UniProtKB/Swiss-Prot annotation:
Subcellular compartments: Cell membrane
Keyword check for Calcium: no
Naturally occurring in which organism (per UniProt): Corynebacterium glutamicum (strain ATCC 13032 / DSM 20300 / JCM 1318 / BCRC 11384 / CCUG 27702 / LMG 3730 / NBRC 12168 / NCIMB 10025 / NRRL B-2784 / 534)
Topology relative to the membrane: Peripheral membrane protein
PANTHER family: MEMBRANE PROTEIN INSERTION EFFICIENCY FACTOR-RELATED
InterPro entries linked: Membr_insert_effic_factor_YidD
GO CC annotation: plasma membrane
Keywords tagged on the record: Cell membrane, Membrane
Protein name (Swiss-Prot/TrEMBL): Putative membrane protein insertion efficiency factor
Disulfide links within the chain: none
Family listed: Belongs to the UPF0161 family.
Coiled-coil features, chain-numbered ranges: none
Job description of the protein: Could be involved in insertion of integral membrane proteins into the membrane.
SMART domains: Haemolytic (SM01234)
Length: 99
């Protein structure tokens, strides 16, 4: 499931599995209907957390993508400076080697 992806954090591939498609649909629902209820942008990261979650579940699948997204959300707060934080192409669970 850890296919090579573009380095562009906004280049989001289409999820392949049904659980990943379901998770991606939940994120898109949040983006379309709930995110706009907040006043202005509140995310201190680039890409924003919902885009990160969408790419994480699309690239790594529902389970691993949810873990990555939860880890990202746990950084949300004044104790973390934020900044550029893209979805990793490979993680600790990957059996692929980076050359």
């Amino acid at each position: 499931m850890c296919a090579p992806t573009s380095d562009d954090p906004f280049d989001i591939p289409e999820p392949k599995s049904i659980p990943a498609k379901t998770a991606a649909s939940a994120v898109r629902f949040y983006q379309k209907y709930l995110s706009g209820l907040k006043m202005g942008s509140t995310c201190r990261f680039d890409p924003v957390c919902s885009t990160y979650a969408l790419k994480a579940v699309s690239v790594h699948g529902a389970f691993k993508g949810t873990i990555l997204s939860a880890a990202r959300l746990s950084k949300c707060g004044p104790w973390h400076p934020g900044g550029f934080d893209p979805v990793p192409n490979h993680g600790f669970w990957s059996t692929e080697t980076v050359t």
